[in-house]
């Protein structure tokens, strides 16, 4: 692959990731109040949300490893992403507090910490990822006394800068530890892709991941424990992201990557993918006025699901048209201007900001 060649399937994966994020946020916004109905919707949120965010972060790692960055570039890009996170928080007061760290602040922190999680300790990419996994497991054990409960409220409540710092590192919705795992996974894919063996590696990892995930499913059945939940008592939990979740999500991302790189299954989302940052940030804005509709009109589970689907499809169309007709007025374009090095930025090589 030449340095200036775009990979359509990377843009397609990015477009798919942002659509899944839109769907998950819409489902969380318009969740039915009935506990029995909410169980069905929670499976949707858990399943799709459990794959959307890891895919987003994996793509970030893939893009960041493409070329070296100066510290000035890192700070500029990270600052931009933190500012976008603040805008998202203001647009979704029903989900976040103004200074709650989220996935965009995680991405900003990953930009700054790439010399750690992206370090090439050995010539073998999988070994490098293994070294990071050992470091993450050690940090998780060391910092476990500081971990907060598996509860959404505790992870978005940010009454002070100190709490915000802990949320960024460990106790938030998308903390650096252990989410750096997915960035390192993306970097690993990128390294193997240069040698055209990425698909074989991903197939092997997928098989291992499927076996481990099936084993956790069998355990949950025998122990009569819920297999997967966003929060609470389950074998796989998203908040916090435990090891069984990391394995399952990594497996899902690997399978999606194989599908995208060997077929044209996600190519239709490629234009959307090139405005993914813009769509991610702006799709929260309507929630400022619409987030109480389900309570005001007592929506049923079916109505909530239909609204979620329509909202997601609308943003798929908006994102595609945005790229085709007004791409100059996007956060991606603004980021390139802010970085002040257009030749080194996202468009030539599917970089992470798109």
What kind of region is each of these model predictions?
Residues 1-354:
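Alpha-helical transmembrane segments and their immediate juxtamembrane cytosolic regions
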């Amino acid at each position: 692959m030449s340095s200036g060649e775009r990979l359509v399937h990377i843009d397609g994966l990015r477009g798919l990731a942002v659509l899944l994020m839109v769907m998950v946020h819409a489902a969380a916004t318009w969740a039915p109040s009935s506990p029995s109905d909410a169980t069905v919707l929670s499976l949707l949120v858990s399943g799709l949300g459990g794959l959307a965010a890891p895919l987003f972060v994996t793509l970030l790692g893939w893009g960041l490893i493409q070329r070296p960055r100066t510290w000035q570039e890192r700070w500029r890009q990270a600052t931009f992403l933190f500012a976008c996170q603040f805008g998202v928080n203001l647009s979704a007061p029903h989900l976040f507090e103004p200074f709650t760290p989220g996935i965009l602040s995680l991405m900003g922190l990953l930009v700054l910490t790439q010399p750690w999680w992206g370090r090439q300790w050995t010539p073998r990419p999988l070994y490098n990822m293994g070294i990071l996994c050992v470091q993450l497991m050690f940090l998780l054990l060391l910092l476990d006394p500081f971990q907060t409960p598996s509860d959404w409220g505790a992870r978005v409540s940010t009454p002070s800068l100190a709490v915000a710092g802990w949320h960024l590192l460990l106790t938030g919705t998308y903390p650096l530890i252990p989410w750096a795992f997915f960035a390192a996974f993306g970097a690993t894919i990128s390294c193997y892709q240069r040698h055209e063996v990425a698909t074989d590696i991903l197939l092997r990892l997928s098989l291992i991941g499927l076996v481990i995930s099936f084993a956790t499913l069998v355990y949950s059945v025998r122990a009569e424990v819920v297999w997967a939940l966003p929060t609470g008592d389950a074998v796989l939990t998203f908040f916090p992201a435990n090891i069984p979740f990391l394995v399952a999500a990594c497996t899902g991302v690997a399978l999606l990557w194989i599908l995208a790189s060997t077929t044209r299954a996600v190519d239709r989302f490629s234009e959307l993918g090139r405005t993914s940052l813009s769509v991610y940030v702006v799709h929260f804005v309507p929630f400022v006025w619409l987030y109480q509709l389900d309570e005001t009109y007592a929506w049923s589970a079916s109505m909530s699901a239909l609204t979620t689907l329509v909202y997601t499809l609308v943003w798929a169309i908006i994102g595609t048209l945005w790229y085709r007709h007004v791409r100059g007025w996007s956060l991606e374009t603004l980021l390139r201007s802010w970085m002040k090095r257009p030749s080194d930025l996202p468009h030539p090589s599917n970089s992470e900001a798109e």
